[in-house]
């Protein structure tokens, strides 16, 4: 079952989510929008197992990364904003 991984612009570039992911779905890429000059990216979502460890590791007040399981609808994804 496919999962959708969304990275939001509240990402502070701390790498906590990348280190927490057991399947290496996430990686850091260059980005000028934060102090760390990097942001999380999810280039391998097909490997996501839906464990949501990345969400648990995120230190921002509003989770900068969200995993939407295959059973969740596109509508519920839109409500996350």
Curated annotation (Swiss-Prot):
Its cofactor is [4Fe-4S] cluster. The keyword Electron transport applies. Pfam families: Fer4_21. It catalyses: reduced [plastocyanin] + hnu + oxidized [2Fe-2S]-[ferredoxin] = oxidized [plastocyanin] + reduced [2Fe-2S]-[ferredoxin]. Transmembrane segments: none annotated. [4Fe-4S] cluster 2 binds at residues 21, 48, 51, 54. It is a peripheral membrane protein. The keyword Lyase does not apply. Binds 2 [4Fe-4S] clusters. Cluster 2 is most probably the spectroscopically characterized electron acceptor FA and cluster 1 is most probably FB. Its main location: plastid. GO terms for molecular function: 4 iron, 4 sulfur cluster binding; electron transfer activity; metal ion binding; oxidoreductase activity. GO terms for cellular component: chloroplast thylakoid membrane; photosystem I. [4Fe-4S] cluster 1 binds at residues 11, 14, 17, 58. GO terms for biological process: photosynthetic electron transport in photosystem I. It is found in: Plastid, Chloroplast thylakoid membrane. Keywords: 4Fe-4S, Chloroplast, Electron transport, Iron, Iron-sulfur, Membrane, Metal-binding, Oxidoreductase, Photosynthesis, Photosystem I, Plastid, Repeat, Thylakoid, Transport. Apoprotein for the two 4Fe-4S centers FA and FB of photosystem I (PSI); essential for photochemical activity. FB is the terminal electron acceptor of PSI, donating electrons to ferredoxin. The C-terminus interacts with PsaA/B/D and helps assemble the protein into the PSI complex. Required for binding of PsaD and PsaE to PSI. PSI is a plastocyanin-ferredoxin oxidoreductase, converting photonic excitation into a charge separation, which transfers an electron from the donor P700 chlorophyll pair to the spectroscopically characterized acceptors A0, A1, FX, FA and FB in turn. PANTHER family: PHOTOSYSTEM I IRON-SULFUR CENTER, PHOTOSYSTEM I IRON-SULFUR CENTER-RELATED. The eukaryotic PSI reaction center is composed of at least 11 subunits. This is Photosystem I iron-sulfur center. It comes from Huperzia lucidula. The gene is psaC.
């Amino acid at each position: 079952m496919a999962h959708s991984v969304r990275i939001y612009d509240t990402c502070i570039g701390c790498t906590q989510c990348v280190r927490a992911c057991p399947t290496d779905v996430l990686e850091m890429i260059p980005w000028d929008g934060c102090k760390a000059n990097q942001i999380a990216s999810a280039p391998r979502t097909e490997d996501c197992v839906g464990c949501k460890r990345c969400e648990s590791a995120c230190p921002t007040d509003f989770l900068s990364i969200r995993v939407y399981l295959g059973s969740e609808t596109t509508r519920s994804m839109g409500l996350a904003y």
